[in-house]
Amino acid sequence: MSEQVALNPSEISELIRKKIDQFSVVSEARNEGTIVSLKDGIVRLHGLADVMAGEMIEFPGGVYGLALNLERDSVGAVILGDSSTLAEGQKGKCTGRILEVPVGKGLLGRVVDALGNPIDGKGPIESSGMSPIEKVAPGVITRKSVDQPVQTGLKAIDAMIPVGRGQRELIIGDRQTGKTAIAIDAIINQKGTGVKCVYVAIGQKASSVASIVRKLEEHGALEHTIVVVAGASDSAALQYIAPYSGCTMGEYFMERGEDALIVYDDLTKQAWAYRQISLLLRRPPGREAYPGDIFYLHSRLLERAARINADEVEKLTNGEVKGKTGSLTALPIIETQAGDVSAFVPTNVISITDGQIFLDVDLFNSGVRPAINSGLSVSRVGGAAQTKIMKKLGGGTRLALAQFRELEAFSQFASDLDDATRKQLERGQRITELMKQKQYSPLTVAEMGVSLFVVEKGYLDDVPVNEISSFEASLHDYMRSTHAALLHAINEAGAYDNEIEAKLKKAVEEFKNTGSW
């Protein structure tokens, strides 16, 4: 006979109670949608009810998308990265976050992609935190007027088209006219000034970017620069967000009472990427097939470049930084087609920025480099930021060049010229020759001041045009070796008075007497 097992009800109920107590229920409310179509890096989802515009959507395999189109029964999103692992029928869920990138001093000296991931093989980045790529630009009350210069180290720019801290100065010209060269020279010239730089490469060849990074490294400028790359092989989505990512990285320094410089190279390619995304999302096309908000694309980016006052810096740092203003200076680059500055995107960006540096193909091909067209170039707010010596000595340069260009065109038809006209033409030729400058050889304020002084005071009038370059180089060497204290004094204060003028006059006359050029 089998042995009967005695069941004690109280023991059973105790066991059940224990099991219930130990059972953990973690519920997760998720807003999920299903992929109904996937093509050309654009995904359409059905069932995402509470998604926000610009929100990150997470897909299987750690792939993220950006919600751009919110329609009645579906959501249009653009894939950030590789979409080859996704398929129709898969789920996409809301994250409740907008796109953020790492910021901080740990990014300096590094090359990152549009999402802030390192691509230079130097290991992970120690960032100071994350910051959203889209921010509201500083308001009128929080801004401070531009009155400090950003020295580019290029005579033609610092004398005629000065750039101030917090300004937006457009560099515009056809392909292969030296636009990137000007921007890279400006970054190299910030070495030792405390200005942090961000270089955003949009739609460029990987070989070109590698060459730029190598040049920055050679000149010791990479250690104060962040390079953000959305190359030609990257998706249109990454090319579209790269400038915003770079801007956020630059704003980190501005908000802490420091000065930063950002170069967008170039915004034409960002506009093309955004046009591609908009057409794939079936948004109605407008002029040149660009969407209706193409102006807003660039204005909301460039308005974030500003100089903010000390109160705003103190507020943003919770009182940690007091009495310091912060600035973000932008140098956007626009590529024109056959010199057409009246096309849609160039006119938009010209109207947004505080001036433009116009580069001319004909000048470039005739050997005038940097090929700056002084007649079409302008700086709307930089004059207030110019140092005294540059303002005093460089003031007449622009006018003299403009008159020279006019007379040059006229003199081609005239057979005999009077003395005054001939003198003006010769002076213009000498100024044009003096404004030429080799790449990667930025000058200090004092060196530029000396060059402008000799042309302003007529010391070049008896120097043959073809010897001006060697004259200038020898003069700079002479000043560095025998008048270093004077150069140091000018560099420190940027001042120009009767005493400095007398010293410069004496030094230049001494040099001319040696005839050593």
From Swiss-Prot:
It comes from the Bacteria. It catalyses: ATP + H2O + 4 H(+)(in) = ADP + phosphate + 5 H(+)(out). One of its GO terms (cellular component) is proton-transporting ATP synthase complex. The keyword Transferase does not apply. The record marks S377 as: Required for activity. Its main location: membrane. GO terms for molecular function: ADP binding; ATP binding; proton-transporting ATP synthase activity, rotational mechanism. Pfam families: ATP-synt_ab, ATP-synt_ab_C, ATP-synt_ab_N. ATP binds at G173, D174, R175, Q176, T177, G178, K179, T180. Keywords: ATP synthesis, ATP-binding, Cell inner membrane, Cell membrane, CF(1), Hydrogen ion transport, Ion transport, Membrane, Nucleotide-binding, Translocase, Transport. It is an enzyme of class 7 (translocase). Its EC number is 7.1.2.2. It is a peripheral membrane protein. It is found in: Cell inner membrane. F-type ATPases have 2 components, CF(1) - the catalytic core - and CF(0) - the membrane proton channel. CF(1) has five subunits: alpha(3), beta(3), gamma(1), delta(1), epsilon(1). CF(0) has three main subunits: a(1), b(2) and c(9-12). The alpha and beta chains form an alternating ring which encloses part of the gamma chain. CF(1) is attached to CF(0) by a central stalk formed by the gamma and epsilon chains, while a peripheral stalk is formed by the delta and b chains. PANTHER family: ATP SYNTHASE SUBUNIT ALPHA, MITOCHONDRIAL. Produces ATP from ADP in the presence of a proton gradient across the membrane. The alpha chain is a regulatory subunit. Belongs to the ATPase alpha/beta chains family. This is ATP synthase subunit alpha 2. The gene is atpA2.
